[in-house]
């Protein structure tokens, strides 16, 4: 009798190799492995070969870099979303694409279930499984970290040795890392103390601001209909553009954030993030928007952005409310066409100029010189009418004191 198949999100590391063997031996599945290339820098073909050598019946390694940036990162950026005011959602936005590909592979392979290596305390388990259920409601999800009986790292390594899985002998960094084209996140180990400063050697994408060049660098980023299309006049594909933005901002130490965030599962956690290119694009986009978006549209968009960020963070990418908000943000983004010039210097990203063909900024209108559509004499009536409710409120309060 043939075994049922399960699709595993496989990184090639020790933990997912153990999960692969555990799914075979303890759950009696034929395991199909899937490794996504999201620009994390790992050798995905090596992971595919390792999966087959570890016992997978099939293994996929897919280059998703362009799709990731074009269909997930850039649409998210149109909202100017920041989770809790800081986080550019680098890990959160990668999970729905991985889940989507897992479901597609499951359908192709006739698999009945999917599995992942996310722990039972984090957000990723929610993001993977919510996305999968939204796309394939009857899919079975297996989360080994919630299910197995291993009590700690020693038990995991003993299981690995028992089944011929190589256990690294070199000492690992005491923190966990998750990387893709948009960012690298660091959690755990010494970072669990929110008073402890991250060690300088931890960072991979950005130089320490103190060690950045002593001369500022200027960069120009052009936007068309809400998305960046060129850097310093060079037209680039979405993935190539983000890669270049990472390189430019990273060498100036731009894009580090350190925050204590509220996880969807109910606890607070400390995360340290490097998002050099994303930070550069965020400031460039806002500079162009300051010229091209109507005041009320801009304020409304910014009011909706935190909700959108929350939906992405909590795993609701494929939910109808996120898709409805996306329609609004995409419509607003049609007005965001122009160029921003930014100055990068020792961890700082400073707007140094912006221009747009359809700019709403009217230099003549804001000039102190007379003329134009604005009559300063009208301002008195404008102020008086807008203060009416406060004047009424004050009169009522004064009457109550008598």
Swiss-Prot record:
<keyword id="KW-0067">ATP-binding</keyword>
<dbReference type="InterPro" id="IPR014729">
    <property type="entry name" value="Rossmann-like_a/b/a_fold"/>
</dbReference>
<dbReference type="Pfam" id="PF00764">
    <property type="entry name" value="Arginosuc_synth"/>
</dbReference>
<feature type="binding site">
    <location>
        <position position="127"/>
    </location>
    <ligand>
        <name>L-citrulline</name>
    </ligand>
</feature>
<comment type="similarity">
    <text>Belongs to the argininosuccinate synthase family. Type 1 subfamily.</text>
</comment>
<keyword id="KW-0028">Amino-acid biosynthesis</keyword>
<feature type="binding site">
    <location>
        <position position="176"/>
    </location>
    <ligand>
        <name>L-citrulline</name>
    </ligand>
</feature>
<dbReference type="GO" id="GO:0000050">
    <property type="term" value="P:urea cycle"/>
</dbReference>
<dbReference type="Pfam" id="PF20979">
    <property type="entry name" value="Arginosuc_syn_C"/>
</dbReference>
<dbReference type="GO" id="GO:0005524">
    <property type="term" value="F:ATP binding"/>
</dbReference>
<feature type="binding site">
    <location>
        <position position="119"/>
    </location>
    <ligand>
        <name>L-aspartate</name>
    </ligand>
</feature>
<dbReference type="InterPro" id="IPR024074">
    <property type="entry name" value="AS_cat/multimer_dom_body"/>
</dbReference>
<dbReference type="InterPro" id="IPR023434">
    <property type="entry name" value="Arginosuc_synth_type_1_subfam"/>
</dbReference>
<dbReference type="GO" id="GO:0000053">
    <property type="term" value="P:argininosuccinate metabolic process"/>
</dbReference>
<dbReference type="InterPro" id="IPR018223">
    <property type="entry name" value="Arginosuc_synth_CS"/>
</dbReference>
<feature type="binding site">
    <location>
        <position position="92"/>
    </location>
    <ligand>
        <name>L-citrulline</name>
    </ligand>
</feature>
<keyword id="KW-0436">Ligase</keyword>
<feature type="binding site">
    <location>
        <position position="123"/>
    </location>
    <ligand>
        <name>L-aspartate</name>
    </ligand>
</feature>
<dbReference type="InterPro" id="IPR001518">
    <property type="entry name" value="Arginosuc_synth"/>
</dbReference>
<comment type="subunit">
    <text>Homotetramer.</text>
</comment>
<feature type="binding site">
    <location>
        <begin position="9"/>
        <end position="17"/>
    </location>
    <ligand>
        <name>ATP</name>
    </ligand>
</feature>
<feature type="binding site">
    <location>
        <position position="117"/>
    </location>
    <ligand>
        <name>ATP</name>
    </ligand>
</feature>
<feature type="binding site">
    <location>
        <position position="123"/>
    </location>
    <ligand>
        <name>L-citrulline</name>
    </ligand>
</feature>
<feature type="binding site">
    <location>
        <position position="124"/>
    </location>
    <ligand>
        <name>L-aspartate</name>
    </ligand>
</feature>
<comment type="pathway">
    <text>Amino-acid biosynthesis; L-arginine biosynthesis; L-arginine from L-ornithine and carbamoyl phosphate: step 2/3.</text>
</comment>
<keyword id="KW-0963">Cytoplasm</keyword>
<feature type="binding site">
    <location>
        <position position="36"/>
    </location>
    <ligand>
        <name>ATP</name>
    </ligand>
</feature>
<dbReference type="InterPro" id="IPR048267">
    <property type="entry name" value="Arginosuc_syn_N"/>
</dbReference>
<keyword id="KW-0547">Nucleotide-binding</keyword>
<feature type="binding site">
    <location>
        <position position="261"/>
    </location>
    <ligand>
        <name>L-citrulline</name>
    </ligand>
</feature>
<dbReference type="GO" id="GO:0004055">
    <property type="term" value="F:argininosuccinate synthase activity"/>
</dbReference>
<feature type="binding site">
    <location>
        <position position="185"/>
    </location>
    <ligand>
        <name>L-citrulline</name>
    </ligand>
</feature>
<dbReference type="GO" id="GO:0006526">
    <property type="term" value="P:L-arginine biosynthetic process"/>
</dbReference>
<feature type="binding site">
    <location>
        <position position="87"/>
    </location>
    <ligand>
        <name>L-citrulline</name>
    </ligand>
</feature>
<dbReference type="InterPro" id="IPR048268">
    <property type="entry name" value="Arginosuc_syn_C"/>
</dbReference>
<feature type="binding site">
    <location>
        <position position="273"/>
    </location>
    <ligand>
        <name>L-citrulline</name>
    </ligand>
</feature>
<protein>
    <recommendedName>
        <fullName>Argininosuccinate synthase</fullName>
        <ecNumber>6.3.4.5</ecNumber>
    </recommendedName>
</protein>
<keyword id="KW-0055">Arginine biosynthesis</keyword>
<dbReference type="GO" id="GO:0005737">
    <property type="term" value="C:cytoplasm"/>
</dbReference>
């Amino acid at each position: 009798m043939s075994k049922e198949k399960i699709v595993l999100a496989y990184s090639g590391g020790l933990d997912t190799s153990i999960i692969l063997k555990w799914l075979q031996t303890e759950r009696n599945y034929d395991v199909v492995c899937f490794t996504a290339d999201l620009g994390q820098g790992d050798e995905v073909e090596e992971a595919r070969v390792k999966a087959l050598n570890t016992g997978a019946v099939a293994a996929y390694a897919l280059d998703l870099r362009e799709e990731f940036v074009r269909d997930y990162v850039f649409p998210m950026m149109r909202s100017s979303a920041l989770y809790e005011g800081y986080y550019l959602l680098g890990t959160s936005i990668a999970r729905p694409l991985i889940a989507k590909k897992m479901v597609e592979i499951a359908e192709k392979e006739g698999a009945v279930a999917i599995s992942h290596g996310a722990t039972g305390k984090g957000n990723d388990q929610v993001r993977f499984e919510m996305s999968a259920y939204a796309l394939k409601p009857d899919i079975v999800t297996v989360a080994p970290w919630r299910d197995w009986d291993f009590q700690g790292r020693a038990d995991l390594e003993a299981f690995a040795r028992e089944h011929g899985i190589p256990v690294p002998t070199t000492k690992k960094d005491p923190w966990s890392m998750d990387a893709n084209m948009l960012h690298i996140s660091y959690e755990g180990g010494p970072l669990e103390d929110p008073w402890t400063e991250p060690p300088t050697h931890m960072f991979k994408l950005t130089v320490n601001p103190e060690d950045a060049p002593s001369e500022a660098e200027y960069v120009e980023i052009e936007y068309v209909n809400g998305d960046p299309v060129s850097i310093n006049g060079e037209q680039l594909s979405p993935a190539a553009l983000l890669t270049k933005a990472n390189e430019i901002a990273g060498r100036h130490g731009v894009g580090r954030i350190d925050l204590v965030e509220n996880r969807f599962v109910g606890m607070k956690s400390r995360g340290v993030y490097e998002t050099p290119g994303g930070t550069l694009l965020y400031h460039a986009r806002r500079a162009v928007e300051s010229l091209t978006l109507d005041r009320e549209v801009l304020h409304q968009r910014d009011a909706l952005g935190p909700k959108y960020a929350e939906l992405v963070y909590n795993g609701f990418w494929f939910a109808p409310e996120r898709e409805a908000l996306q329609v609004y943000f995409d419509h607003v983004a049609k007005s965001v066409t122009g160029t921003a010039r930014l100055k990068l210097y020792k961890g700082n990203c400073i707007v140094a100029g912006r221009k747009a063909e359809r700019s709403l900024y009217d230099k003549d209108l804001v000039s102190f010189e007379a003329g134009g559509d604005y009559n300063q004499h009208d301002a008195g009536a404008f102020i008086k009418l807008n203060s009416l409710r406060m004047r009424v409120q004050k009169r009522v309060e004064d009457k109550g004191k008598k």
